[in-house]
Amino acid sequence: MASLGVNIDHIANVRQARRTVEPDPVPMALLAELGGADGITVHLREDRRHIQDRDVDLLRQTVRSRLNLEMAATEDMVLIALRVQPDMVTLVPERREEVTTEGGLDVSSQRVDLTSKISRLQDAGIPVSLFVDPERGQLEACRDCRARWVELHTGTYAEAKWTDQPSELARLTEATALARAMGLRVNAGHGLTYQNVEPVAAIEGMEELNIGHTIVARAVAVGLQQAVREMKALVQNPRRDPLFGSY
């Protein structure tokens, strides 16, 4: 049974749209936990477009589930993580011109640098996950870098036409099995919604799904706690969808 990590970046996006103090993502994280979130995820970007350093510091003090800090693999970010001590760091690619993370980290081309940074974080007691596309070469590179976790990028699955989604789901299923055979633990996220999450949640060996935008969008109508409850029910009790066959 997969657990649910709630990404609260989009709450901070609303705040930063007016450069004001509300809505504050820190108390919103508590509401997400009250709704059943198994963890809270935030992405501290280099350009600080949504989550701020202050948010991360306060969340470390207040989150009672797990705090997952997404960040670029830069020296400045490593130093912040070592100071804050989140429960997990997820290393992600980052480009200033992107609206949101557009794809997985190219671990294969950065093995030496990533291995060093992963070692420093894990030696400090912070498990590291790498956000990657569901590809054998990237998973092998993650293993070689001695990461403990991978987070599979589900964006291609989420954005695929319904006729193509079964093959994308198969890629995620195969990548999950391969990663586990390599000794890696597996999370997934990006673009998942109330409409497409169940087949991914049902993948054998999938440990956690990190979901943000769709929950915050639903919260506008029903409130954050209820939005989280609804997603948690789908993640924990995924139904069999005839479109995807038996999974």
From Swiss-Prot:
EC numbers: 2.6.99.2
Keyword match Iron: no
Biological process according to GO: pyridoxine biosynthetic process
InterPro entries linked: Aldolase_TIM (IPR013785), PyrdxlP_synth_PdxJ (IPR004569), Pyridoxine-5'_phos_synth (IPR036130)
Annotated positions binding 1-deoxy-D-xylulose 5-phosphate: 9-10, 45, 50, 100
NCBIfam families xrefs: pdxJ, PRK05265.1-3, PRK05265.1-5
Function summary: Catalyzes the complicated ring closure reaction between the two acyclic compounds 1-deoxy-D-xylulose-5-phosphate (DXP) and 3-amino-2-oxopropyl phosphate (1-amino-acetone-3-phosphate or AAP) to form pyridoxine 5'-phosphate (PNP) and inorganic phosphate.
Protein's name in the database: Pyridoxine 5'-phosphate synthase
The species this protein was found in: Synechococcus sp. (strain WH7803)
